Regions:
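Alpha/beta enzyme core
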Residues: 1-58, 75-81
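C-terminal helical cap(s) of enzyme catalytic domains, especially alpha/beta-barrels
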Residues: 94-120, 124
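A mid-to-C-terminal "edge-of-domain" accessory segment
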Residues: 114-248
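Glycine-rich phosphate-binding active-site loops on the catalytic face of alpha/beta enzymes
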Residues: 81-98
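Beta-strand segments within the central parallel beta-sheet cores of soluble alpha/beta enzyme folds
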Residues: 32-33, 61-64, 88-89, 118-127
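Conserved structured core elements
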Residues: 12, 16, 30, 39-46, ...
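Predominant activation on well-ordered alpha-helical scaffold segments within soluble catalytic domains
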Residues: 16-20, 46-53, 73-80, 87, ...
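Active-site-proximal loop/turn and secondary-structure-junction residues that shape catalytic pockets
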Residues: 4-9, 35-39, 64-70, 90-94
Length: 248
């Protein structure tokens, strides 16, 4: 595989001459489309791939970085234009902002384009956590696909939606089922953005009955406590609030 580093920033006519010469006079079993510094846009990738394919008839591979957050989109566009091999890394580890994340790329191809790579996507979350552990890598808890809190529901309006629709129409509430990537099932959490149904869900969980006025009082107390704590409330804190509100 011929890997012309930083090809995306080279003069296009010069680049095309170089790859054509290597393809005809040297040894090239495949060509990597290399965007070393992640500077290409999806529109530029389409142009890049089409002109490359017009010049040489070799299998194309993608190698895109995430410096501007375009690595996954660029990879998908390149595949749609005929690239056959994808270079990606688990959770996007790599130089600077990293490479196109494997998880994101796989899910985009599978759910948006119907491309099944044969990879067992239900193992992605476990694999990502393992890589993070051995690599001592920090990652946002709400990271797409494999984040630890990705399926937490704090917003009151989403909690109501989940309560009313998820049992029979799960994909009305989420873009994909957590089982698809080995994630846990959703949970409603309690914080400053909670709503009345958030409270009702947790009251049902701990088997406490409350009037509408008490539910509203509990919600106000939950919001105030969350703002003071600057974070979500745990079960012990919620039970304490419920005890205070139901007694008063």
């Amino acid at each position: 595989m011929f890997f012309p580093i930083d090809a995306s920033r080279a003069d296009m006519s010069w680049y095309l001459k170089v790859i054509e010469q290597v393809a005809t006079q040297g040894h090239m079993d495949a060509l990597a489309l290399v965007d070393t510094f992640g500077v290409l846009s999806p529109h530029a990738v389409r142009y890049f791939v089409r002109h490359t394919r017009e010049r040489i008839k070799k299998p194309l591979e993608t190698h895109f970085h995430m410096d501007f957050g375009m690595g996954v989109a660029n990879t998908v566009i390149a595949v749609a234009e005929g690239a056959e091999v994808i270079h990606s890394t688990i959770s996007g580890i790599g130089e600077r902002a990293g490479n196109a994340p494997t998880e994101d790329t796989l899910l985009a191809l599978l759910t948006m384009y119907g491309v099944d790579t044969g990879i067992k996507t239900e193992r992605l979350t476990k694999l990502s956590r393992y890589v993070r552990k051995i690599g001592r890598l920090a990652m946002p808890a709400n990271r797409q696909i494999v984040g630890d809190t990705l399926f937490d529901i704090e917003s009151g309006i989403i909690a109501s939606w989940y309560k009313n629709a998820a049992k029979d129409h799960f994909l009305e509430v989420f873009p994909f089922h957590p089982n698809l990537v080995g994630q846990r099932m959703p949970r409603v959490v309690l914080g400053k953005n909670s709503g009345l149904d958030s409270i009702r869900i947790h009251l049902d969980r701990i088997r406490v009955k409350a009037t509408d006025d008490q539910v509203n009082d509990i919600l106000l107390r939950v919001k105030a406590a969350s703002l003071k704590k600057k974070g979500l409330l745990d079960d012990k804190e919620f039970r304490r609030i419920v005890k205070q509100a139901v007694r008063s």
